[in-house]
A protein has these predicted regions:
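Hydrophobic alpha-helical connector segments
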Residues: 70, 84-113
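Amphipathic alpha-helical segments used for helix-helix packing
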Residues: 99-102, 110-133, 147, 166-169, ...
């Protein structure tokens, strides 16, 4: 559980991005979790990185797990909200292939453009704990929307390959590892989305799909 209370005043000027001390704590934790590891990071080191007392941190987050939960939730909330909107709001208006491409491109862009590469935390042993059930459920729902759209996209081509959506989901999440290795470019999210559609049998229509996908992103984001 987290607290939105103001906490105690700091003894130095803010040195991190964020409108509030809570935002600065999240930014510091994200940096430390992704650079030195979750297990190796203490709440004291997070507080030191923000420039506040450890006791002040506890006004905002009771435990380190609370911080991790908030960060993990943030990695899927935007992509899931967009996928829900596209899956429901554009049904019957845009082709399934275009909707899958838009979801993949939007999701991949979020993963690649976030300040810290938080996706590398997905497979921490700690995340298997039931306290992270909300994050795990949201990620599973997002994966299910990929599958739904992928099945529809493949079905339109006469293919029976409903796994295209799941493969697209995995291609998008592979951007996390590519980013960790310094191999992500500005084109990487588009390349992942394109590859997913090709695997769904929609390669010949890719130019039209890209155009409709861009329109969906402009409309629903």
């Amino acid at each position: 559980m987290t607290s939105a209370g103001p906490g105690r005043p700091r003894h130095q000027q803010p040195s991190r991005p964020g409108a509030t001390a809570r935002d600065e704590i999240l930014d510091a934790a994200a940096e430390l979790f992704t650079t030195q590891g979750y297990a190796s990071t203490s709440t004291r080191s997070i507080a030191d990185a923000v420039g506040i007392r450890q006791s002040s941190l506890y006004h905002h987050f009771k435990t380190k797990d609370d911080i991790l939960e908030d960060l993990l939730d943030g990695t899927v909330s935007g992509g899931l909200a967009f996928a829900r909107a596209v899956a429901a709001g554009a049904e019957g208006e845009a082709a399934p292939g275009s909707r899958l491409h838009a979801v993949a491109l939007y999701d991949g862009t979020q993963l690649c453009s976030a300040r810290w590469n938080l996706g590398i935390l997905y497979h921490l042993p700690e995340v298997r704990n039931e306290r992270f059930a909300r994050f795990l459920a949201d990620r599973q729902e997002l994966r299910g929307l990929y599958r739904q759209l992928g099945g529809s996209a493949a079905g339109e081509t006469g293919m029976q390959e409903a796994g295209g959506g799941d493969v697209t989901f995995r291609l998008v999440e592979s951007l996390i590892s590519l980013r960790a290795d310094g191999l992500v470019t500005g084109d990487s999210p588009l390349q992942a989305a394109d590859a997913g559609l090709i695997l769904c049998g929609r390669g010949p229509e890719l130019s039209a799909i890209r155009a409709e996908s861009a329109a969906l992103i402009a409309r629903f984001s």
